Every structure is written in structure tokens, then in C-alpha cells.
Amino acid sequence: MRKNPFSDTLSFLTTGGWTTVVFWLLLLASVGIAFLNFRRDPRQRSALHVWNWLSRLFIGALWWQQSLWKLPPTYTDQPDGSGGLRYWIGQMIQGAAFHVQADFVKKIVLPHFYFFAPQVYAGEVLLAMSLMLGLFTRVGGFLGALMAVNLWLGLYRLNSEWPWTYFFLIVIQIMFVAYRPGRSLGLDALVGHEESMPVSRAGRSG
């Protein structure tokens, strides 16, 4: 049960096994990459770039946290394989906005759960890494938007869900596709550093 955002964040950062260690490595790597960009490129030293970095960092952390209740080998949060991803996939049968999605989940996805579950888990982990490290963020944003659309439509009719939550996530991920937040204190900025360097006068005159 959640208590408050501060104690819950502290618990998230200090409890758990290997997943907490990996998250800390991603977090420290993100900070280190941001510092390197900030030091190398004066154009990165702006409030806008810092905000873009924090935005993708937090959304990346969201996807990482969401992957924790669908860990292999069961891809659920119970040793017997119940709950977790299997439960929420089942909820889409009842909550999907359109019958075609509900039928697909019922007839294709659930009967082949262990084919689709690793793809969902891997997708969320890769998405979290992409956004936290600022690497291939357009691809990460596009993948995140698709996953959010699936959640928005798949759980739309459930009274326990607020559809706007997923819709806002779609909007944010599309903004990542459009504005390439990895160019703000991320690995995308380091990789594209030479390309983005200003053209010299000699180069312009030539």
C-alpha cells in the first residue's frame, strides 16, 4: 500500500535486489552523461536542456518501475504465475474500448502468454534505458507511445482506471519523438556532438 511519494521513493531507492542495483547504475550513468555534456558543450547549459533531461529521466524511471511487477520467469508478481502482467492482460478482455482488441487479447495473447510476456518486459526495460540514458530517444518515445496507446484503449472501460493518465503519457512520448530529448544532456547529444558543432567561417565561405 502506498503511503506518500517521499517515503515511497526512498523505499524504491533503498529496497529490492538486483533491480535496485541496476536502476542505481542507470541513474548514476544518466547523471554522469549529463555532467559530461554540460561540461563539454556550452549550448547544453540552459534551463530548457536540464528540464528535457529531467523529463525523460522521470518517464524512463516510470517505465523501469512498471517492469518490476512483470519480472521473468513468471512475468507476474506471484511465484505461481498469477497476478502481474497476466492479470492486467486479462483485464483488457473486459476493459478494452473496442471488441477487436479484446478478442485479440482473449484468443491470441493470453493463450500464448509466455510468447508475448518477454516482449513486453524487454520493451519496457529497453524503453527505460533509452530515456534514462538519452540514447535513441526518438525510437524510445515512439515505442513508449505505442505501449501507452495499448494501455489507453485496452483499459479504457475499467472504472478503476483514469483514461487520461495513459492519454497524457501518449502526449509526453510523442513530444519525445518530436523534440529528441536525448539531445539534451544525453548520449544522443554526445554521439551527435560533431554533427551539431557550428560551421566555421571558413566552412561557410567555402
Regions found by a protein language model. Name each.
Residues 126-130:
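Transmembrane-helix motifs of polytopic, lipid-linked glycan transferases
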Residues 1-97, 103-123, 133-206:
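Extended, low-polarity transmembrane helix blocks
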